[in-house]
Design a protein with these regions (language model features):
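Residues lining hydrophobic/aromatic ligand-binding pockets adjacent to catalytic sites
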Residues: 1-184
């Protein structure tokens, strides 16, 4: 279950405790790190914010399958060292996933190879974004128009860089239309 709300605001401790109470021990969440860290500060000078966020989320740490570092399109290859330093602040084998949006990381060139190699070496998942279905939908209502304006249109690069690959599938509003995107 993706916890997208953490991207927009850090929940209260009470909310986190309610999420814990509402789930079984074998349930796994995927939480996004706050956009204040990933987008606004672009992983710079955010150690205190990260510490505060992780402290609030602590009651759920054993129920997190992956922590998502969703990066903005402006976060490119020139920032890779910053990503490396940021991820090094987590304990080894902490369940991290990185979602990139800069087109250089989809070019099959040296920048993408460097990213993927580093992710493999550090057991960090590269999150696969598949937004094709939402862009295949006719923009005939507000929700679709909004999604098409906000969601990234990046190539689908099916790659597993660690042991828990994750696909963010942004589906077509008509369920039947999604099936063609599941076929290789």
């Amino acid at each position: 279950m993706e916890g997208n709300t953490t991207f927009y605001a850090t929940p209260t401790l009470n909310t986190v405790q309610n999420w814990r109470a509402a789930t079984h021990d074998d349930f796994r969440f995927t939480f996004k790190l706050p956009k204040a860290i990933t987008h606004e500060q672009m992983l710079r000078g955010c150690s205190e914010q990260l510490r505060d966020f992780m402290k609030v989320m602590e009651p759920l740490h054993d129920r997190v399958g992956q922590w998502t570092i969703q990066l903005p399109a402006a976060f490119g290859p020139e920032h890779l060292d910053r990503l490396k330093n940021f991820c090094a602040s987590f304990p080894p084998n902490f369940p991290l996933g990185v979602e990139v949006r800069h087109m250089a990381f989809f070019s099959k060139g040296e920048e993408e190879r460097a990213l993927n190699q580093w992710l493999v070496e550090n057991n960090i998942d590269r999150i696969i974004m598949d937004s094709r279905p939402v862009f295949a939908a006719k923009p005939n209502n507000e929700a679709i128009i909004d999604a098409q304006m906000k969601k990234p249109r990046v190539p689908v690069h099916a790659i597993a860089t660690a042991s828990h690959p994750l696909i963010r599938f942004i589906g077509h509003p008509e369920e039947q239309q999604n099936y063609e995107f599941f076929t290789p």
